[in-house]
Amino acid sequence: MTLFTTLLVLIFERLFKLGEHWQLDHRLEAFFRRVKHFSLGRTLGMTIIAMGVTFLLLRALQGVLFNVPTLLVWLLIGLLCIGAGKVRLHYHAYLTAASRNDSHARATMAGELTMIHGVPAGCDEREYLRELQNALLWINFRFYLAPLFWLIVGGTWGPVTLMGYAFLRAWQYWLARYQTPHHRLQSGIDAVLHVLDWVPVRLAGVVYALIGHGEKALPAWFASLGDFHTSQYQVLTRLAQFSLAREPHVDKVETPKAAVSMAKKTSFVVVVVIALLTIYGALV
């Protein structure tokens, strides 16, 4: 079920998910606007409710019509939670603006892509493009690699854990876009995701190390296994940058393309691993 769902979701996401319509983040915005108080307890409570509703839905559909409705729910939740249709539009808009030397449009789209972690003030063009690469790699992790990890971890209840992670991701993006840094801090969302991302970041990091320059990346990856304080964003992007060391860092079009190309390779490796685990009976 996991492999079948993953393949179909990735195919549908690539063909049809070109905007916000099939994005959980967009569907939850109306609900998030009603939240007036921010705390860690509220963040966890909302997430548990989302997971609980998903669990009850799957439980109610068990055994109905040869589990066809269950399969459809797996696909629907996977399509809502995996992939970043709107972000992909922002990325292509950035490339168009950069190729036309439209500095205003380019800066606007880069701002959308780097919304969560931002770009250091006063950085030069090379540093700016490296941070843009990092943002694209992180988007690939947040919208593809990490959701797939939680879908797998959940086993037969994969959509439940996937929904929980995607809900937290949507909550963080909404807070970053519409609320103050203080409200985001009060919500505790960054701390929760720091914990949840620890394992999937290390798994993604070892893939980056193996497909890139392992002689530099692998020692850094082993060092990260004992690091519980550095942000997961920094851990992942530092490992990825070892693999991107020989790629261009001065071309405003080719630099982000190099990051996206490597992110696609990593996603492909993950799908292959899922297929092998399914073949050998480790996944359902």
Swiss-Prot record:
Which ranges sit in the Cytoplasmic compartment? 61-67, 212-267
Q: What induces it?
A: The level of AmpE affects the basal level of beta-lactamase expression in the absence of AmpD and in the presence of the AmpR transcriptional regulator.
User: Which cellular components does GO assign to this protein?
Assistant: plasma membrane
Keyword check for Membrane, yes or no.
yes
Instruction: List UniProt keywords, sorted A-Z.
Output: Cell inner membrane, Cell membrane, Membrane, Transmembrane, Transmembrane helix
Periplasmic membrane side: 1-43, 85-194
Pfam families attached to this UniProt entry: AmpE (PF17113)
Which function does this protein serve? Answer: Putative signaling protein in beta-lactamase regulation. AmpE seems not to act as a direct sensor for beta-lactams.
State the name under which the record lists this protein. Protein AmpE
Q: Which organism is it from?
A: Escherichia coli (strain K12)
Which gene is transcribed and translated to give this protein? ampE
